């Protein structure tokens, strides 16, 4: 009988002080959860900014690669009438004496020196 009274008194004391600590524990848990969410949010924001920076770098690299691998636009060869289309490479669109009088248009020729 004495042991039952001791256990019951311990039970009452434990429940009384347990309830008092429960409110403190809940507040601490709320603070911990808020801090974790805050840290997760900051980590997510840092990851998003890093992702945006990587995407910007990737887009510039892809543009450079596309420019490097792209074909030369269509152009006209030597001794071909030019007008709408540009002449290839080192050729220039000039009026010449040889073909100009017949076709009445400039031709792609090598530029004259001098």
From Swiss-Prot:
Residues spanning the signal sequence: 1-20
Keywords: Cleavage on pair of basic residues, Disulfide bond, Ion channel impairing toxin, Knottin, Secreted, Signal, Toxin
Function: Ion channel inhibitor.
Protein localization: Secreted
Protein family per UniProt: Belongs to the neurotoxin 14 (magi-1) family. 03 (ICK-30-40) subfamily.
Cited InterPro entries: Toxin_22
Residue positions assigned to the propeptide: 21-74
GO cellular component, one term: extracellular region
Free-text comment about domains: The presence of a 'disulfide through disulfide knot' structurally defines this protein as a knottin.
Highest taxon of source: Eukaryota
Protein name from the UniProt record: U17-barytoxin-Tl1d
Cystines in this chain: 75-88, 82-93, 87-108
Reported tissue expression: Expressed by the venom gland.
GO molecular function list: sodium channel inhibitor activity; toxin activity
